[in-house]
């Protein structure tokens, strides 16, 4: 029975004496079914059977460990990718939130200005209408004048920003 070179990480071909002088490579030992292995083990000594089964178990465990490492690395990469995407989304939402807060503050200021204006218009007496259109207008109602003036102010401030 020969043993593989321990210095090399790659699996070396290991030959085991088998039935009718046949030998098994590590790959064959790992890939064969239990039934095939048992057929191959017939006629070998108890010690050889134990060594061969131990070798098979060691090789299979090595394979499982390798696939586990690959799976762990893949999962880690996927989680890091998801983390980056979520961080980008958080930054985007924080930016939108800040923008909406600014917009809300601007709207509050406009609202307060409109309320102040409406109060001043409601307190001040309305001057009678003059000019050529005055006859067709009739008496001016303070609420309507104030609403028209307020709308004009809002539109002119909005247009000035654009």
Swiss-Prot record:
UniProt keyword terms in alphabetical order: Acetylation, DNA-binding, Isopeptide bond, Nucleus, Phosphoprotein, Repressor, Transcription, Transcription regulation, Ubl conjugation
- Residues of the bZIP domain: 51-114
Question: Outcome of mutating residue 60 to A, per the record?
Answer: Abolishes acetylation. Has no effect on binding to NFE2 but impairs the DNA binding and transcriptional activities of NFE2
PTM:
Acetylated in erythroid cells by CREB-binding protein (CBP). Acetylation augments the DNA-binding activity of NFE2, but has no effect on binding NFE2. Sumoylation at Lys-14 is required for active transcriptional repression.
Region (Disordered) location: 1-24
User: Gene Ontology terms, cellular component aspect?
Assistant: nucleoplasm; nucleus; RNA polymerase II transcription regulator complex
Protein name from the UniProt record: Transcription factor MafG
What organism is recorded for this protein?
Homo sapiens
Gene name as annotated = MAFG
């Amino acid at each position: 029975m020969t043993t593989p070179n321990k210095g090399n990480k790659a699996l070396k071909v290991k030959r085991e004496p088998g039935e009718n002088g046949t030998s098994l490579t590590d790959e064959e030992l790992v890939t064969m079914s239990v039934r095939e292995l048992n057929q191959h083990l017939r006629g070998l000594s108890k010690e050889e059977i134990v060594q061969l089964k131990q070798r098979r178990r060691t090789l299979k465990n090595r394979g499982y460990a390798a696939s586990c490492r690959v799976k762990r690395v893949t999962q880690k990469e996927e989680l890091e990718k998801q983390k980056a995407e979520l961080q980008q989304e958080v930054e985007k939402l924080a930016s939108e939130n800040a923008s909406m807060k600014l917009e809300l503050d601007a709207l509050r200021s406009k609202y307060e200005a409109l309320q102040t204006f409406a109060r001043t218009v409601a307190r001040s007496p309305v001057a009678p209408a003059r000019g050529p259109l005055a006859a067709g207008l009739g008496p001016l109602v303070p609420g309507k004048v104030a609403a028209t003036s307020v709308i004009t102010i809002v539109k002119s401030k909005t247009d000035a920003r654009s």
